[in-house]
Protein backbone atom coordinates (compact mmCIF):
# COMPACT_ATOMS: atom_id res chain seq x y z
CA UNK A 1 0.00 0.00 0.00
CA UNK A 2 1.09 3.54 -0.70
CA UNK A 3 -0.58 5.29 2.24
CA UNK A 4 1.04 8.33 3.89
CA UNK A 5 4.02 8.40 1.54
CA UNK A 6 4.68 12.01 0.63
CA UNK A 7 6.82 13.19 -2.25
CA UNK A 8 7.47 11.91 -5.74
CA UNK A 9 10.16 9.44 -6.79
CA UNK A 10 10.49 10.96 -10.29
CA UNK A 11 11.92 7.62 -11.50
CA UNK A 12 15.30 8.34 -9.86
CA UNK A 13 17.40 7.01 -7.01
CA UNK A 14 17.26 9.05 -3.83
CA UNK A 15 20.75 10.50 -4.39
CA UNK A 16 19.93 11.48 -7.98
CA UNK A 17 16.62 13.01 -6.92
CA UNK A 18 18.24 14.96 -4.09
CA UNK A 19 21.01 16.28 -6.37
CA UNK A 20 18.52 17.19 -9.10
CA UNK A 21 16.28 19.13 -6.71
CA UNK A 22 19.31 20.89 -5.20
CA UNK A 23 20.51 21.93 -8.67
CA UNK A 24 17.03 23.10 -9.63
CA UNK A 25 16.70 25.12 -6.41
CA UNK A 26 20.06 26.80 -7.06
CA UNK A 27 18.99 27.60 -10.63
CA UNK A 28 15.67 29.01 -9.43
CA UNK A 29 17.36 31.27 -6.88
CA UNK A 30 19.94 32.33 -9.47
CA UNK A 31 17.58 33.11 -12.36
CA UNK A 32 14.31 33.49 -10.40
CA UNK A 33 12.45 31.71 -13.23
CA UNK A 34 13.06 28.23 -14.68
CA UNK A 35 11.23 25.89 -17.05
CA UNK A 36 10.90 22.20 -16.18
CA UNK A 37 8.38 19.37 -16.20
CA UNK A 38 5.25 19.77 -14.09
CA UNK A 39 5.97 16.96 -11.56
CA UNK A 40 9.52 18.28 -11.00
CA UNK A 41 8.14 21.80 -10.58
CA UNK A 42 5.63 20.67 -7.96
CA UNK A 43 8.34 18.78 -6.10
CA UNK A 44 10.73 21.74 -6.33
CA UNK A 45 8.17 23.88 -4.51
CA UNK A 46 8.57 21.61 -1.47
CA UNK A 47 12.32 22.33 -1.42
CA UNK A 48 12.30 26.07 -2.16
CA UNK A 49 9.51 27.34 0.10
CA UNK A 50 11.07 26.18 3.42
CA UNK A 51 14.44 27.64 2.36
CA UNK A 52 12.94 31.10 1.82
CA UNK A 53 11.11 30.86 5.15
CA UNK A 54 14.42 29.90 6.79
CA UNK A 55 16.20 32.85 5.14
CA UNK A 56 13.75 35.40 6.54
CA UNK A 57 15.71 35.32 9.80
CA UNK A 58 19.38 35.97 9.03
CA UNK A 59 21.39 34.03 11.60
CA UNK A 60 24.59 32.04 11.29
CA UNK A 61 22.71 28.86 12.12
CA UNK A 62 20.13 29.50 9.40
CA UNK A 63 22.85 30.30 6.87
CA UNK A 64 24.55 27.00 7.70
CA UNK A 65 21.28 25.11 7.30
CA UNK A 66 20.69 26.78 3.93
CA UNK A 67 24.26 26.04 2.81
CA UNK A 68 23.78 22.43 3.86
CA UNK A 69 20.81 22.20 1.48
CA UNK A 70 22.18 24.30 -1.43
CA UNK A 71 26.01 23.91 -1.27
CA UNK A 72 26.60 27.26 -3.03
CA UNK A 73 27.89 30.27 -1.08
CA UNK A 74 26.91 32.89 -3.64
CA UNK A 75 23.34 31.60 -3.86
CA UNK A 76 23.00 31.42 -0.06
CA UNK A 77 24.13 35.05 0.14
CA UNK A 78 21.64 36.06 -2.56
CA UNK A 79 18.90 34.12 -0.76
CA UNK A 80 19.50 35.91 2.55
CA UNK A 81 20.32 39.41 1.21
CA UNK A 82 18.00 39.78 -1.82
CA UNK A 83 15.29 37.11 -2.03
CA UNK A 84 14.17 36.71 1.59
CA UNK A 85 13.81 40.47 2.34
CA UNK A 86 11.42 40.80 -0.63
CA UNK A 87 9.17 38.15 0.94
CA UNK A 88 9.38 39.45 4.53
CA UNK A 89 5.65 40.23 4.77
CA UNK A 90 4.45 37.21 2.80
CA UNK A 91 3.41 34.23 5.00
CA UNK A 92 4.30 31.54 2.45
CA UNK A 93 3.60 30.84 -1.20
CA UNK A 94 6.87 32.31 -2.44
CA UNK A 95 7.00 30.52 -5.79
CA UNK A 96 4.45 30.18 -8.57
CA UNK A 97 4.05 27.13 -10.83
CA UNK A 98 2.44 27.93 -14.19
CA UNK A 99 1.55 25.24 -16.71
CA UNK A 100 3.45 25.78 -19.97
CA UNK A 101 2.11 23.31 -22.53
CA UNK A 102 3.79 20.07 -23.53
CA UNK A 103 7.34 19.16 -24.56
CA UNK A 104 7.77 18.35 -28.25
CA UNK A 105 9.80 15.15 -27.90
CA UNK A 106 7.68 13.17 -25.46
CA UNK A 107 4.63 15.37 -24.75
CA UNK A 108 5.64 15.72 -21.11
CA UNK A 109 3.64 18.47 -19.36
CA UNK A 110 5.92 21.48 -18.86
CA UNK A 111 5.76 24.21 -16.25
CA UNK A 112 7.39 27.52 -15.42
CA UNK A 113 8.49 28.01 -11.81
CA UNK A 114 9.06 31.60 -10.75
CA UNK A 115 9.55 33.49 -7.52
CA UNK A 116 6.47 35.57 -6.80
CA UNK A 117 8.08 38.97 -6.11
CA UNK A 118 10.87 38.74 -8.65
CA UNK A 119 12.12 41.78 -10.55
CA UNK A 120 10.30 41.94 -13.87
CA UNK A 121 12.46 41.87 -16.98
CA UNK A 122 12.59 44.79 -19.42
CA UNK A 123 10.15 43.00 -21.76
CA UNK A 124 7.13 43.77 -19.54
CA UNK A 125 7.14 47.58 -19.45
CA UNK A 126 3.38 48.19 -19.17
Curated annotation (Swiss-Prot):
Pfam families (alphabetical): Ribosomal_L17
Domain of life: Bacteria
Cellular-component GO terms for this entry: cytosolic large ribosomal subunit
Family the entry assigns: Belongs to the bacterial ribosomal protein bL17 family.
HAMAP family: Ribosomal_bL17
Quaternary structure, from the entry: Part of the 50S ribosomal subunit. Contacts protein L32.
Protein's recorded name: Large ribosomal subunit protein bL17
Annotated source species: Coxiella burnetii (strain CbuK_Q154)
Gene that specifies this protein: rplQ
Amino acid sequence: MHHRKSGRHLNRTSAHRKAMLRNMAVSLFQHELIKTTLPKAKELRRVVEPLITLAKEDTVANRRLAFNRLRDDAIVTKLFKEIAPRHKERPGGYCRVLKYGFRNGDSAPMAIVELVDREESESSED
